[in-house]
Amino acid sequence: RDISVVPFLSNHWDRELGQAALARREELAGQLAEAVERYDLDGVNVDIENLTENERDLHTDFIRILRDKLPDEKIIGVSVAANPYGITTDWKGSYDYESLGKHSDYLMIMAYDEHYRGGEPGTVASISLAEKSIQYALSKVPKEKILLGIPFYGRIWKNGSGFPQGVGISNMEVQTLVSQYEGSAAFDPETFTPTATIKVKEKDEKLKIRGIPIGPGTYTICYENELSIKQKLRLIEKYDIKGTGSWSLGEETADTWEYYKLWSNGCYFDDVGKHWARDYIIKAYKKNWVMGVTQTTFCPDRPLTRAEASAMLVRLLKLPAQFFEESTFTDVSGHWAEGAIDTAWSHNI
């Protein structure tokens, strides 16, 4: 399928395990290089978390050693904490963006967990977290080495006390819970993220979260949806960075890859994702043959006007523009497509 396979190495937030790995970094780097060669992998992504500024230089040295041991064509990615305010202590301070960037192909900014398990309810990934994290990264590494991490999950809190308090929940599970318990959803235009509220009654069937049935009560869910993810995707173009990655595959909703395909082809039309002509629309849009009605709508089933047909044919045939002081037609003066209409007419179209 022409897909690069780059597995990730993680300590799963275990500080002692991460420290032990860095203490034996020469040996570990050798083992990773051997595995990449043995399984014909395309590289490795290093995701060591929950260390401190005390391990910063060791972390960088590990990536340097790994780069020396891997062939140049193999990819090295490093997952780094989102650091919108340039903190140099604690686990955010364990990543030297500038030095890591010199020895790796990209830094994957984990722009999520703004609020976390055991903490107060709140956004997992606000738009400001994503944007400020990109801005900080750009001050340290080239734009072509930056990936924006976008979550495919949210977190759920029970109002008051009791399980769960900020447990992770996939975007797919959110849809199920909201549907099952007839929940309500709202969208915050400031953080550009959705929040859902569900009420579980004593008599309701108890669905499970992380294997544990949820009890009666009111729950708040902060998560991601199509609108919030699309807004983050726009940041990729705004700052012209390498691209995006997500945590984690399998937690996304069924329609996610429909609009990711549109985004990867440079358009954000909300109304063509499952349309029978989607691929043709994308191709025509990429070739600049057709435009959208707005930036986010294409209106694929709307009838085509003569003006739109003229503009499309002029672009498709790459006809040189023609303008007349007095148009042959009495009803096109000042029309947005006047130039295209004149051009089409001059070519007997």
Report each predicted region and the residues it spans:
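Substrate-binding cleft and catalytic face of glycoside hydrolase catalytic domains
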Residues: 1-49, 53, 65-83
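Feature responds to low-complexity, polar/acidic, surface-exposed segments characteristic
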Residues: 15-19, 265-278, 286, 291-339, ...
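Short, acidic/polar
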Residues: 20-37, 89-98, 224-237
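Receiver (REC) domain switch/active-site residues of two-component response regulators
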Residues: 42, 105, 242
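Conserved, mostly hydrophobic/aromatic
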Residues: 46, 107, 148, 236, ...
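Substrate-binding surface in catalytic domains of secreted glycosidases
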Residues: 52-181
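Glycan-binding loop/region signatures in secreted carbohydrate-active enzymes
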Residues: 152-235, 261-264
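Acidic/aromatic/glycine-rich contiguous surface patches that form carbohydrate-binding/processing clefts
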Residues: 228-266
